[in-house]
Amino acid sequence: MSTPSRFKKDKEIIAEYESQVKEIRAQLVEQQKCLEQQTEMRVQLLQDLQDFFRKKAEIETEYSRNLEKLAERFMAKTRSTKDHQQFKKDQNLLSPVNCWYLLLNQVRRESKDHATLSDIYLNNVIMRFMQISEDSTRMFKKSKEIAFQLHEDLMKVLNELYTVMKTYHMYHSESISAESKLKEAEKQEEKQIGRSGDPVFHIRLEERHQRRSSVKKIEKMKEKRQAKYSENKLKSIKARNEYLLTLEATNASVFKYYIHDLSDLIDCCDLGYHASLNRALRTYLSAEYNLETSRHEGLDIIENAVDNLEPRSDKQRFMEMYPAAFCPPMKFEFQSHMGDEVCQVSAQQPVQAELMLRNQQLQSRLATLKIESEEVKKTTEATLQTIQDMVTIEDYDVSECFQHSRSTESVKSTVSETYLSKPSIAKRRANQQETEQFYFMKLREFLEGSNLITKLQAKHDLLQRTLGEGHRAEYMTTSRGRRNSHARHQDSGQVIPLIVESCIRFINLYGLQHQGIFRVSGSQVEVNDIKNSFERGENPLSDEQSNHDINSVAGVLKLYFRGLENPLFPKERFTDLISCIRIDNLYERALHIRKLLLTLPRSVLIVMRYLFAFLNHLSQYSDENMMDPYNLAICFGPTLMPVPEIQDQVSCQAHVNEIVKTIIIHHETIFPDAKELDGPVYEKCMAGGDYCDSPYSEHGTLEEVDQDAGTEPHTSEDECEPIEAIAKFDYVGRSARELSFKKGASLLLYHRASEDWWEGRHNGIDGLVPHQYIVVQDMDDTFSDTLSQKADSEASSGPVTEDKSSSKDMNSPTDRHSDSYLARQRKRGEPPPPGRRPGRTSDGHCPLHPPHALSNSSIDLGSPNLASHPRGLLQNRGLNNDSPERRRRPGHGSLTNISRHDSLKKIDSPPIRRSTSSGQYTGFNDHKPLDPETIAQDIEETMNTALNELRELERQSTVKHAPDVVLDTLEQVKNSPTPATSTESLSPLHNVALRGSEPQIRRSTSSSSETMSTFKPMVAPRMGVQLKPPALRPKPAVLPKTNPTMGPAAPSQGPTDKSCTM
């Protein structure tokens, strides 16, 4: 009984699907018929226009009686058509048909003829209509080819859905069958067990053997059916997932075709038709206006209708005339099979890894396709604009023919010399057809690419929702630093308005990488709240814990400039600024704009300089935020430079956008600097309420650095004693450069290659060893905690001022990369995680720390002397914060304060010991040693603090469980939000979200007020508790070849280049 009902169920589902596909196929055929009918109507209309002007030219010398007969003839002809009756009933005429009717009405008013007018009709207007008719037919044929291609693609998608649906039905049926067989085997096993419970002393020996063998057979059969059921169940889940993904992609493709592609196809059919018809009729109008001024009233009506020749409105009317053909169909719904209640993509454990891999592949593929599609789209739009320029050329004015009293022959020669010149026509037509061919080729490429993007995006979005990875945005808005206590006082009369400065500062801190900023609108309610707060004299953006939406803050900034009574660019300068477009050389154009803007008031010029410097900085992140100078100009052009009402809004807006784009790109050339114009200047590097200088600022040349710190001691690799380490977890190297080892293996470490890697040896092989997978034997008690606590010891020494370090101290595993490699890393680097920025120093530059060296003394818990070891020198060697890599990457100078190790540790776990750096003290920039008493006092305080923390650690270790690097971090993030005044690490999920799929260059700027990102020893776990491997595997560093005469690479507290680590 189950088999017939199952087949009946399958047939019903398939029949319903085939019926829906059949309706779509019929709809596609009907659409093609409608387009063909539209083209035939246009050709017939153009033929009528040709006949009309030909007849009108023949009887132009007759009296008004003959003209009236002509008008009546064509009016009767149009009234007899079926389409005319429909148009008359609906009162919804297409703009070309409306022009045709008004033209016939105008003919009734004509009462006079002229030879010049007859010549213009025969040799100018009729030829235009012939060309329009040819163009319309050609456009329709090319559009028809694209339509057939789109129809085939759509049917392929529907067939694919049909195949996937049947596959899903088949696997689900097999799963149900396997389940029933498994249940049957279980019942047989239960029966056999029941029999085996009978007393065995009444059973003969032969029967006992038979029962045992039957029990074994039933058990084997049950195991086979259990395996078969599991296999079929997995296949059913995968088939259902594939069905749901294909279903989502199919619905997206169908929706895109009906909403976007159909509109584009109709535009292709209309390409140049209205514009060319506009030109032909304007030629007629020009002749009529010069022939007799008494006919102006009637001709004004026709001119108004010609001006209303609008392809968009005609397209809307045309689609409304045939709603059944152009209405999008209903979305395909998921058809559950045999009581299957799961209607979503399943992310269960057997398929979760596969779905995550597929999601990553889709994301990577989509990123590439979107870039390619955007480039093709720009090319298509530029080509379309070229075609529109060709078909909208204003060559319809024939007023020159009526300026003097001439004979018919002279008029004919004049006309033929202008528009009808054969070489001119041939060249123009050839250019137009060549451009049209290129346009259709690019349009086809764009439509095919966008179709693929639509399908992949639909699958990606569904997988993203299923896997629950859509929360990256909230991590990107975490606090990036604490507010400087010396924030500058701003009164109500400040040069830069408070609302402008606060919005720009907020975007600088939290929104430089925000995709679609200024283009995506924010919440209107939030925008009004922020605006009202500023109007009350408050600053709602001063609180760094505020969770305002970036799009809303950007909307407030645009709303402020839009609401100015006097625009930032005065209306009196609008014409002069627009005229700069004629200058092709961008640098000369910028100089011309500079001359015009220097005439503006000083206050306006300062605000302009501040705003456009910010927009230029924002455009440097166009790879992340998708807002290049052109897109920013589109958003700010209408706001900063509104087009006067007397100007053409459409044509002028493109020129306005080009002017604003030029100012954004060449703002440094256009606006005077701080020496020429005193006033606030936009700072790229902002922290809290204060700012520090741009990362481009120079702290001295490399030669100066060498001279100032040339006496820094070095330690070569030969002088280093190997360190012994024990593996905490199993590790398999991902390349020949990485070492593989088992848990508990002994390794020898030579020196630290980066924050995540060691150079070491295992089983006679040299290579890289990941720091998180090992326990360093003699480093846990000396230098690991020393590095992690160096900032605490530096904080007690007073403010840190600018200093220079030797170029020899800039030895980092990634410092000597080639420029081309760094350039590639900068291009594809993702936005770094937010971290604290250093406070501003007295001279206006970001503070720069000198390297720290350890003295050659020993240390124990009872002595204030400091430890000394060659490895200490290697680990304490600094890196110049103002390295060329850092200067080349603006806005990222302070973002490496959060390291991988910090993100994997408990926030509240105290360090084992504090240690201070001896030798060159970080509190001074003149390389002078401290007073011995001061050093002794500082060391004593540090050691007392370390002892107290050791006692506290011992107390906590008896209560708390061993830390789990994943669960503990997640629990802290969930229960205790990160305060704005700390640089505690984010959760591992945050690191995953920030790092994405590409490595990035991470740098930091040392500060006396912030915690250093260094290597802290983890708390030893309790006995019996098994540690887990790190949540994230470090990406191997690409190490350059070291010079034997140079010291080995060492980690630094400066801006370590993390471009090669994960």
From Swiss-Prot:
Skewed-composition ranges (Basic and acidic residues): 899-908
Site residues, Arginine finger: R519
Domain Rho-GAP: 481-671
Domain SH3 positions: 720-779
Start-end of Low complexity biased regions: 1004-1013
Ranges for domain F-BAR: 19-314
Residues with Phosphothreonine modification: T978
Biased composition (Polar residues): 785-799, 914-923, 974-988, 1053-1062
Keyword Coiled coil assigned: yes
GO molecular function, one term: GTPase activator activity
Name of one Pfam family that matches: RhoGAP
Coiled-coil blocks: 352-382, 933-960
Keywords: Coiled coil, GTPase activation, Phosphoprotein, SH3 domain
Entry superkingdom: Eukaryota
Residue segments, region Disordered: 785-931, 974-1013, 1028-1062
Sites bearing Phosphoserine, chain numbering: S416, S812, S894, S909, S976, S1009
BP terms from Gene Ontology: cell migration; Rho protein signal transduction
Domain comment (free text): The F-BAR domain mediates oligomerization, binds membranes, and constrains plasma membrane protrusions.
Quaternary structure and interacting proteins, as annotated: Homodimer. Forms a heterooligomer with SRGAP2 and SRGAP3 through its F-BAR domain. Interacts with CDC42 and RHOA. Interacts with FASLG. Interacts (via SH3 domain) with ROBO1.
Function: GTPase-activating protein for RhoA and Cdc42 small GTPases. Together with CDC42 seems to be involved in the pathway mediating the repulsive signaling of Robo and Slit proteins in neuronal migration. SLIT2, probably through interaction with ROBO1, increases the interaction of SRGAP1 with ROBO1 and inactivates CDC42.
Protein name listed in UniProt: SLIT-ROBO Rho GTPase-activating protein 1
Organism: Mus musculus
